[in-house]
Amino acid sequence: MDKREEGTVEEPLDLIRLSLDERIFVKMRQDRELRGKLHAYDQHLNMILSDVEETIKVVEKDEETDEEIIRNIKRNIKMLFVRGDGVILISPPLRTS
């Protein structure tokens, strides 16, 4: 029996395969986060996502008080190619039994 038919997870990339055509969360280097629908991926974790919401965390320093100011910048992207070497983690959608 083919494991693709069973929907089982035997290898780490199987979990990503089960998330095809689902919304996923991707944490990237440089304090970037992506949420979007996964259309394709490869063994290097290169991915094609659609309807993406990108959140970038920006830390600025107030020159007068020397306090750090943290801002989140958000933008929406219709279609995005994600290069796998910048990926830290991928979280599949929550599944209910």
UniProtKB/Swiss-Prot annotation:
Residues 11-96 form the Sm domain. GO terms for cellular component: catalytic step 2 spliceosome; Lsm1-7-Pat1 complex; nucleolus; P-body; precatalytic spliceosome; sno(s)RNA-containing ribonucleoprotein complex; U4/U6 x U5 tri-snRNP complex; U6 snRNP. It comes from the Eukaryota. It holds the Pfam family LSM. Keywords: mRNA processing, mRNA splicing, Nucleus, Ribonucleoprotein, RNA-binding, Spliceosome. The keyword Magnesium does not apply. One of its GO terms (molecular function) is RNA binding. PROSITE patterns: SM. It is found in: Nucleus. InterPro entries: Lsm3, LSM_dom_sf, Sm, Sm-like_LSM3, Sm_dom_euk/arc. GO terms for biological process: mRNA splicing, via spliceosome; P-body assembly. Component of the precatalytic spliceosome (spliceosome B complex). Component of the U4/U6-U5 tri-snRNP complex, a building block of the precatalytic spliceosome (spliceosome B complex). LSM2, LSM3, LSM4, LSM5, LSM6, LSM7 and LSM8 form a heptameric, ring-shaped subcomplex (the LSM2-8 complex) that is part of the U4/U6-U5 tri-snRNP complex and the precatalytic spliceosome. Belongs to the snRNP Sm proteins family. Plays a role in pre-mRNA splicing as component of the U4/U6-U5 tri-snRNP complex that is involved in spliceosome assembly, and as component of the precatalytic spliceosome (spliceosome B complex). The heptameric LSM2-8 complex binds specifically to the 3'-terminal U-tract of U6 snRNA. This is Probable U6 snRNA-associated Sm-like protein LSm3. It comes from Dictyostelium discoideum. The lineage of its organism: Eukaryota, Amoebozoa, Evosea, Eumycetozoa, Dictyostelia. The gene is lsm3.
